[in-house]
Amino acid sequence: MIATLTFWRSRQTRNKVVFEEERTRGKAPVIGTMYVSKDWLDAAGNPEEITVTVATGDDA
């Protein structure tokens, strides 16, 4: 199974940026909240939105 998820910047902590998963009406979130290193985001251009692909089993 493969899921491609979109996350939006929510807030910051001291060393991380918090992203919230874009919600689909009527479906539970796959991940929900994700913390990403500020250093990595600085190198990536500080995006407001990130996309994550999750794969399981033979799809990985």
Language model features: what each stretch is:
Residues M1-K27, E49-A60:
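Long, compositionally biased stretches
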Residues P29-L41:
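Short beta-strand-centered segments at strand-helix junctions
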Residues G45:
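Short active-site loop/helix that positions an aromatic residue
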